[in-house]
Amino acid sequence: MSTVTTPSAPKVGFVSLGCPKALVDSERILTQLRMEGYEVVATYEDADVVVVNTCGFIDTAKAESLEVIGEAIKENGKVIVTGCMGVDANVIRDVHPSVLSVTGPQQYEQVVNAVHDVVPPRKDHNPLIDLVPPQGVKLTPRHYAYLKISEGCNHSCSFCIIPSMRGKLVSRPVGDVLDEAKRLVKSGVKELLVISQDTSAYGVDVKYRTGFWDGQPVKTRMTELCQALGSMGVWVRLHYVYPYPHVDELIPLMAAGKILPYLDIPFQHASPKILKLMKRPAFEDKTLARIKNWREQCPDLIIRSTFIVGFPGETEEDFQYLLDWLTEAQLDRVGCFQYSPVEGAPANLLDAAIVPDDVKQDRWDRFMAHQQAISAARLQMKIGKEIEVLIDEVDDRGAVGRCFFDAPEIDGNVFIGLEEGSTVQPGDKIMCRVTDADEYDLWAEML
């Protein structure tokens, strides 16, 4: 009697670097591979081939990408490279000539085909019986997911090379976005994080064309998209919002509890001179007035932003202007980066004085200390208040979660002590009272 052995599934290792947009690209590739019967493994040693999704936004990200590619080659030998750094394939091949394939961002089919070339899918695989969840493969915890609504960007910020890597704005059909959101919610997702290169430009490229979802007309526009997402009964958080005038239309939705009162707006600087050099909107006085107006309409509004210090041409006067602006703006969550030249960025050609590295570091230190004091004071005002917390982790010390003013990975946490025998699990939403705070985090007790 002969024994029939079933061939094992081909195995793929995957490393995803960079921003949430790249993470969504990775999820899409992995979903396709899983549908074709590939098994995703967690170690280089177990993989038949390794895919590295790179980041190429700044030099440190490129260095990390090259390092990870080298590590994958050393540990496995068969490496496929994709992502933003892939647009400059020669740089990758000069350092790592043995890579099997190099593709740029959003080239999903080429990546899958490259995997096929190295390790073909099983011929006997039946995709109709494969256990790929309806929402696809996700690299985030089950209770939150990134929802990418567009690709590319129409802006020409002088420090950025995103348009050259990801192209001009291409908005996803509104029906497709809402169908994906509905599948995610049905699968148990409690928080949708809306992302793109420029979320508030959604629909500009198609002139806000009217689409259809659930038999109803819906404009391909951020306001209408948020209205529809807000009807799904989950947290909806907006990231990468460019401060267009129509952002004002979102504040009533936040005040009414339809979407989270949270805006992630990368202002980048406040000095009119530096903003002009960056090719960013230079209406910092109007921005302060808008922030004041937003908070009058929605007192719970949380504003997150990112800034760059040490940009070419930045003087001490410009930097002090930025600190004074921060004092006026009273932003809740802030990140700061020291300017780093990016190959191919227009800023490299500016006729402006280069800021020395030691001055950049000094300004970064002062910026962070200044904003920490603002953040600490604003969080102190939360003590004694009742908040809803979405639980991310539970261990023997208690639970770690986030309330509406905390995005995962980039903002603070809420630490909660739990009684013995507690049934609280990741993904639960619980009501808590804030008992303490520091510069970034809150401590709370369960109600």
UniProtKB/Swiss-Prot annotation:
UniProt EC number: 2.8.4.4
Domain MTTase N-terminal stretches: 10-120
Q: Which cofactor does it need?
A: [4Fe-4S] cluster
Residue ranges of domain Radical SAM core in the record: 139-377
- GO CC annotations, alphabetized: cytosol
Give the matching Gene3D superfamilies.
Answer: Methylthiotransferase, N-terminal domain, Nucleic acid-binding proteins, tm_1862 like domain
Q: How is the cofactor bound?
A: Binds 2 [4Fe-4S] clusters. One cluster is coordinated with 3 cysteines and an exchangeable S-adenosyl-L-methionine.
Keyword 4Fe-4S applies: yes
Record function comment = Catalyzes the methylthiolation of an aspartic acid residue of ribosomal protein uS12.
Q: What is this protein called?
A: Ribosomal protein uS12 methylthiotransferase RimO
